[in-house]
Amino acid sequence: MGYFIDRRLNGKNKSMVNRQRFLRRYKSQIKQSISDAINKRSVTDIESGESVSIPIDDINEPMFHQGRGGLRHRVHPGNDHFITNDRIERPQGGGGGSGSGQGNAGQDGEGEDEFVFQISKDEYLDLLFEDLALPNLKKNQYKQLTEFKTHRAGYTSNGVPANISVVRSLQNSLARRTAMTASKRRELRELEETLKALENSEPAQLLEEERIRKAIAELKQKIARVPFIDTFDLRYKNYERRPEPSSQAVMFCLMDVSGSMDQATKDMAKRFYILLYLFLSRTYKNVDVVYIRHHTQAKEVDEQEFFYSQETGGTIVSSALKLMDEVVQERYDPAQWNIYAAQASDGDNWADDSPLCHELLAKKILPVVRYYSYIEITRRAHQTLWREYEDLQAKYENFAMQHIREPEDIYPVFRELFHRQTVDN
């Protein structure tokens, strides 16, 4: 009775190597699909991964074929409409509806739908936050924030052909063949010695010599059947993500919850901050996050209250900046911490308060932070706060501004604010 031994180590994911190769090959199309999909779902809904669709034309293999232009001579069966040397005009639009994707309908022809497949939670987050990093991150005196980088980590028994280690695979092949044939080779040597002794003995023992020769031939066949290389022998260079100490960092999240922020605007602000939280927790092992809500008064709150509290009031943006400055002085020494801030507001502020915000940022906050981002969420025209901040953007490289009008603007704005930059040591 024969047995099949499954030596594959991928468990249920027996096509993982092919899947990873596919994700690398069509990364740009997949990232575009994810960018489109994030606007149609909650950013917190990541447990189920994401269904990704790729136009079928993008994954078809290239092929040579005749172009649609020019004149071609064909021989067709005759009928009562056409005679020899008649010219037949091509149908407008290039044919009768064959093709894929969106376009005009045709009465005949065939096409294919977009290719749709499911990616996991980890694959979704890796692609979502690829090429993003905290800007201007520098190494300070105390290193607690941990980044992950890819390093060589020995060998593994599964991987892609590009990472195969020929030397290690041949070493394993030699060891396996030696172990599997050692007893047979030892028996073969004994039989050969016995046969040699019988050939030199008197009188000749022909029947015994013939039996030993058959046994020797069978042993040689068994040894020859042991494959030179087996999938069990293959070894691939292994790579793993290792935590590397970097500078410690803190992110201040300042959210306007005043009465001018309607529910739709607040929801967009929360979605931006949830995206920021997922990015920080996914990319960095240790990072402090300080949540500040403000209307006429600012208050440091926990994560639950920041996202779900219903408290509201008037608008004095400077109250949040003053509180941030106090927290920095009390807990986060700029010489030891990389300080970041993300402020979201609808831009509506008490008229006399906007110049004070400009002064607080210019004199106290921007000199000590690595990066300060302001996100204005409104469909209306910009007001005094935006104009005050525009002056800061022109003077300070570590100050950035973006405008969100619709929910579909959130992810592109987020990527623009936190795209990976050169890191100073």
Swiss-Prot record:
Q: What domain of life is recorded for the organism?
A: Bacteria
Q: Which HAMAP family does the record associate with it?
A: UPF0229
Fetch the NCBIfam families from UniProt: PRK05325.1-2, PRK05325.1-3
Q: Taxonomy-wise, where does this protein's organism fall, top ranks first?
A: Bacteria, Pseudomonadati, Pseudomonadota, Gammaproteobacteria, Enterobacterales
Report biased composition (Gly residues) as residue ranges: 92-108
**Protein's recorded name:** UPF0229 protein YE2273
Write out the ranges of the annotated region (Disordered).
84-110
Family the entry assigns = Belongs to the UPF0229 family.
